[in-house]
């Protein structure tokens, strides 16, 4: 250690040329065995130069390469656009927004006074939705259609069922109120 101090006295600048001492950054002088091991070491340390092996394309494999025709591309794009439009229409209309919060639900008025904003559809107009969307109808919509059929046959019974429905919703609301007041 004292020999190292004598060769490099404190406070004296060293020359820019490397001495016989090997620094920690001189990896190429390390004896790692054959050239392959040396390249692996340099690659793992992040100092190795990567050899360019050619163009690598993700998914470019014989088993996965399936090229679509222009017609298939158009068909897929049209389906995606129609699905997007349907979802945006239903989101903006608020038609399928049945739950407003924990324990709260939308009250449907059949008189036409409490229509949801943006829901200007008449009941007589056909829905622009595909037949696949008919499977996703909620139970409340099915109940409404059965009530409309009953209204044509027995108007007095429908009023009673509406009153019962309102009483049920009020009864549910009593349990939802906060217990702090």
UniProtKB/Swiss-Prot annotation:
The keyword Cell wall biogenesis/degradation does not apply. The modification Phosphoserine is found at residues 15, 17, 63, 87, 125, 145. There is a cross-link at residues 13, 62, 75 (Glycyl lysine isopeptide (Lys-Gly) (interchain with G-Cter in SUMO2)). Residues 1-181 are annotated as: Disordered. Keywords: Acetylation, Isopeptide bond, Phosphoprotein, Ubl conjugation. The keyword Amino-acid biosynthesis does not apply. Belongs to the SMAP family. This is Small acidic protein. It comes from Bos taurus (Bovine). The lineage of its organism: Eukaryota, Metazoa, Chordata, Craniata, Vertebrata. The gene is SMAP.
């Amino acid at each position: 250690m004292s020999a190292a101090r004598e060769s490099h006295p404190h406070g004296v600048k060293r020359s820019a040329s490397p001495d016989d001492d090997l620094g920690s950054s001189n990896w190429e002088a390390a004896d790692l065995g054959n050239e392959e091991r040396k390249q692996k070491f340099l690659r793992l340390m992040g100092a190795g130069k990567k050899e360019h092996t050619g163009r690598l394309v993700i998914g470019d494999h014989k088993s996965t390469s399936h090229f679509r025709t222009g017609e298939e591309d158009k068909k897929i794009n049209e389906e995606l656009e129609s699905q997007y439009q349907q979802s945006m229409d239903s989101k903006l209309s608020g038609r399928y927004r049945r739950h407003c919060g924990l324990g709260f639900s939308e009250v449907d008025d059949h008189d036409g006074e409490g229509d949801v904003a943006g829901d200007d559809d008449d009941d007589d107009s056909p829905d622009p939705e595909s037949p696949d969307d008919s499977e996703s109808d909620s139970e409340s919509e099915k109940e409404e259609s059965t009530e409309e059929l009953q209204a044509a046959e027995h108007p007095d019974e429908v009023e009673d069922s509406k009153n019962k429905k309102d009483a049920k919703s009020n009864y549910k609301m009593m349990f939802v109120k906060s217990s702090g007041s």
